[in-house]
Structures are given as C-alpha cells and as structure tokens.
C-alpha cells in the first residue's frame, strides 16, 4: 500500500509540473522577440552590410554609401524608402556604443528576453523623458491628491460641527435675531432659513479649529514654485531680526513679541489667532521667551492644575 501511495504522489507532481516540450515552445517563441525589437526580423549588421566587429568609422561609411542609394531624395521607389527606414534605424542602433553593446548582448543571449527588452526600452525612451517634465507631473499629481485630502477633511469637519447642539442653538438664535422672533410659514421663510444658515456656516468656517480651510498656497507644487521667494523672504526676515534686536538692541515689536510667545508655548498660528486679545496680551507681558519666566509660568500652570483637581 505504501508503494501505491508513492506512485500516486509521483503522478501528482508530474501532473503539476509543466511539460518540457511546452517550456521549450515558449522559449522558442520568445527568443526572436529579443532581437526583433531592434531591427525587426533583420540583422542590424546585415542591413548595413558590415561585420559585427566593424568599427564606428566603417559603420558610418556603410551608412553613407547606402543612403546615397536608398535615400528618398535619391530614390523615389516605395520599396527603397522602406529599406532606407530600416537602414537608418540600424545605423542609429550601431553608431552608439551603449545601444550597440545592448544589441550585441541580445544577439549573444537571446534567451534573456525580458532583460533585453527592458534594456531596449530604457535606452530608447528613458533618455527621451525630460526630468523637468517628470518632476512637474509628479508635483501636479501630489498636489491634486493633497488638495482633495484637505477638502475632504475640511468638509467632514464642517459637517461634524453642524451636527452639534451648539451649532443648532446658534442657528436658532441667529434666526430669531433676524426675524425678530416672528415665525413665518410663508414661502420666503425657507429662503430666510437658507440665508441664515449660510451666514452661520461662514462663521463656523472662521472659528473651526484643528482643520485648516483648503488653500492652493499650501500645496506642495505651489510651495515648490515659490521656494526661491520663500527662502529670500526668510533670509530677509532673519537679517532684519538680527539687525533690530541683536545689533541695535531695540525692544520687541508687538507682532514679534507675539511670535516669540507663540514659539515658546508651541502654539500653531491658527490657534493663536483664535485666542482673545486679553489672554494674548497677558501671555506676551509675561515674556515667556525668557527661560526664567517660562519656568515660572510652567510652575504656575502645574499648581493651578493641581488646585482644580
């Protein structure tokens, strides 16, 4: 019984393996493709009438001689025109050391079909691609996805805010303020509701935190284009800062003091804008960019946090 089981396993493995004749047929079908991508069914050397070890000078002379005979300006025969196209293609392949080396390798190793094909397309189409065009295309694609992502996140945040009780209560209060507390069931009432909701939506867009409104100026593509301007602006700002506060020892302007305070507290710009003026002034007056003041402020915040517990 064990012998029967072994025979069965052997027959299954033989059935799973592809027949040798099929593999041989596939290889024989693919091998001509390796050479055909260069000069189709012809041999590039035979088209120019030179040997495979011919030097560049001999190849140029052969091409010049054949062009005098088969060039469309010299010979109007349609068949001669077709032949000249093949001759010109063969010359383009053999005059360049790189493509000629790849062609010689394809002749010597016709079984490496996929490698030879990849080498051919890399040589003929890779160098024709302008890196600047690739970079611009890549930036456009990335910027498009970036904008869609920003728009999706912002729209989702707006819809989430609209479902909150605070938004609905504010909407009712604004409607009450507009209508004077008079409820109307006329046709224009729905239009009034839409206008009120639109006004409130604009207010929500200004006050929403955590998600910024989509902007073309924040896209990577736009930032890349404006990179020289941005670098110049930063360098100019740093120079002015150094000159004003390091050399001349002037007191900090209000905007610069706000900037130092915001950087010390690690507060994003949009969050800082939403802080009321009284709290801003209170924070700026503490001069938190100075180490001792910052340590004192942190200690006060910790005490306040413990007291509230």
UniProtKB/Swiss-Prot annotation:
Parts of the chain that traverse the membrane: 131-151, 220-242
Example GO biological process: protein folding
Major localization listed first in the record, in broad terms: endoplasmic reticulum
Pfam families for the chain: DnaJ
Gene3D superfamilies in alphabetical order: DnaJ domain
GO cellular component: endoplasmic reticulum membrane
Intervals, Cytoplasmic compartment: 152-219
Keyword Cytoplasm: no
Keywords: Chaperone, Endoplasmic reticulum, Glycoprotein, Membrane, Signal, Transmembrane, Transmembrane helix
Membrane protein topology class: Multi-pass membrane protein
Residue spans, topological domain Lumenal: 37-130, 243-309
SUPFAM superfamilies xrefs: Chaperone J-domain
Function statement: May play a role in protein folding in the endoplasmic reticulum.
Protein name from the UniProt record: DnaJ protein ERDJ7
Annotated organism of origin: Oryza sativa subsp. japonica
């Amino acid at each position: 019984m064990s012998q029967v089981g072994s025979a069965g396993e052997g027959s299954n493995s033989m059935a799973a393996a592809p027949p040798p004749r099929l593999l041989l047929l596939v290889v024989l079908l693919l091998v001509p493709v390796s050479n055909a991508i260069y000069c189709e069914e012809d041999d590039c050397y035979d088209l120019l009438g030179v040997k495979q070890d011919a030097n560049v000078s001999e190849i140029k002379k052969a091409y010049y001689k054949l062009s005098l005979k088969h060039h469309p300006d010299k010979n109007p025969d349609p068949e001669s025109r077709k032949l000249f196209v093949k001759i010109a293609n063969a010359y383009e392949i053999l005059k360049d050391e790189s493509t000629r080396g790849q062609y010689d390798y394809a002749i010597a190793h016709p079984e490496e079909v996929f490698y030879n094909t990849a080498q051919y397309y890399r040589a003929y189409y890779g160098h024709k691609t302008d890196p600047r065009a690739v970079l611009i295309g890549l930036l456009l694609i990335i910027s498009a996805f970036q904008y869609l992502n920003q728009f999706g996140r912002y729209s989702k945040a707006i819809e989430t805010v609209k479902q909150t009780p605070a938004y609905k209560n504010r909407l009712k209060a604004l409607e009450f303020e507009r209508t004077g507390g008079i409820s109307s069931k006329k046709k224009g009432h729905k239009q009034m509701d839409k206008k009120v909701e639109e006004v409130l939506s604009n207010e929500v867009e200004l006050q929403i935190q955590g998600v910024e409104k989509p902007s073309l100026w924040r896209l990577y593509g736009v930032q890349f284009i404006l990179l020289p301007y941005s670098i110049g602006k930063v360098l100019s700002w740093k120079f002015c800062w150094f000159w004003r506060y390091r050399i001349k020892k002037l007191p900090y302007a209000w905007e610069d003091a706000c900037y130092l305070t915001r950087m010390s507290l690690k507060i994003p710009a949009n969050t800082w804008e939403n802080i009321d003026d009284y709290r801003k002034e209170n924070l700026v007056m503490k001069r938190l960019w100075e180490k001792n003041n910052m340590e004192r402020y942190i200690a006060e915040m910790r005490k306040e946090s413990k007291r509230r517990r």
